[in-house]
Amino acid sequence: MATLFIADLHLQTEEPAIVAGFLRFLAVEARQADALYILGDLFEAWIGDDDPNPLHREMAVAIKSLVDSGVPCFFIHGNRDFLIGKRFARESGMILLPQEKVLDLYGRNVLIMHGDTLCTDDAGYQAFRAKVHNPWIQRLFLTLPLFIRRRIAARMRAGSKAANSSKSLDIMDVNAQTVVAEMEKHRVQWLVHGHTHRPAVHELSANDQPAFRVVLGAWHHEGSMVKVTPDNVELIAFPL
């Protein structure tokens, strides 16, 4: 019995080793799981379910194969792929979740999220996030021709990269008070998230009890997953 969590794969055709590693993961490790949760940024960018990128179809088929084998797959949007919609969910068999979700895992309540909403010290990013998550802005963007959406997405990624290069690492990490507030709001002692690309298990206090924040790593030179069993919560790095 085990439930698996991954995040921040940033899949793109320019990184075939990561794509191949994910396909192996779906065919091997994930097949033994009770469920797989993808906590955002599965793709490097997503400009709409109507994008004919062959990689998207390949990943949908692979995930659907996992689901058809009896392993449900759940997805929380990240800051790169927040426009993944019902069409891709239907094609892949994934179940879309809200940005925050509490799971009962073998008697242990665990809060899961992508993690970008925890980085409240980065006021610039949070303001940008509020704009792009505005439903009417998203609807307007999705009505644009694909070639225009690609240009906008490329400019946004370039702008984000330039902005992050001038920010301190602390600003781009989670805010400790925000973490505790979220855990106490949901009354949990465990939090699993991605986004920061800083894999670690942090001990803290929430609800006047010991608590733990488990951060998934990004898939760059190695894969990263959290494995929850009835007896343990493990952060595991593995070769791609």
From Swiss-Prot:
Named cofactor requirement(s): Mn(2+)
Cofactor: binding comment: Binds 2 Mn(2+) ions per subunit in a binuclear metal center.
EC number: 3.6.1.54
Binding site for substrate: 79-80, 122, 160, 164, 167, 195
Gene3D superfamilies assigned to the protein according to its UniProt record, in alphabetical order: 3.60.21.10
Sample GO molecular function, one term: UDP-2,3-diacylglucosamine hydrolase activity
Positions of Mn(2+) 1 binding: 8, 10, 41, 197
GO biological process: lipid A biosynthetic process
Matching SUPFAM superfamilies: Metallo-dependent phosphatases (SSF56300)
Recorded catalytic activity of this chain's protein: UDP-2-N,3-O-bis[(3R)-3-hydroxytetradecanoyl]-alpha-D-glucosamine + H2O = 2-N,3-O-bis[(3R)-3-hydroxytetradecanoyl]-alpha-D-glucosaminyl 1-phosphate + UMP + 2 H(+)
Pathway the protein contributes to: Glycolipid biosynthesis; lipid IV(A) biosynthesis; lipid IV(A) from (3R)-3-hydroxytetradecanoyl-[acyl-carrier-protein] and UDP-N-acetyl-alpha-D-glucosamine: step 4/6
Residues the entry annotates as binding Mn(2+) 2: 41, 79, 114, 195
One family name in Pfam for this protein: Metallophos
A Gene Ontology term for the protein's cellular component: extrinsic component of plasma membrane
UniProt keywords, alphabetically: Cell inner membrane, Cell membrane, Hydrolase, Lipid A biosynthesis, Lipid biosynthesis, Lipid metabolism, Manganese, Membrane, Metal-binding
Subcellular location, record wording: Cell inner membrane
Membrane topology per record: Peripheral membrane protein
Described purpose of this protein according to its UniProt entry: Hydrolyzes the pyrophosphate bond of UDP-2,3-diacylglucosamine to yield 2,3-diacylglucosamine 1-phosphate (lipid X) and UMP by catalyzing the attack of water at the alpha-P atom. Involved in the biosynthesis of lipid A, a phosphorylated glycolipid that anchors the lipopolysaccharide to the outer membrane of the cell.
Family of the protein in this entry: Belongs to the LpxH family.
Annotated protein name in UniProt: UDP-2,3-diacylglucosamine hydrolase
Organism annotation: Salmonella schwarzengrund (strain CVM19633)
Gene: lpxH
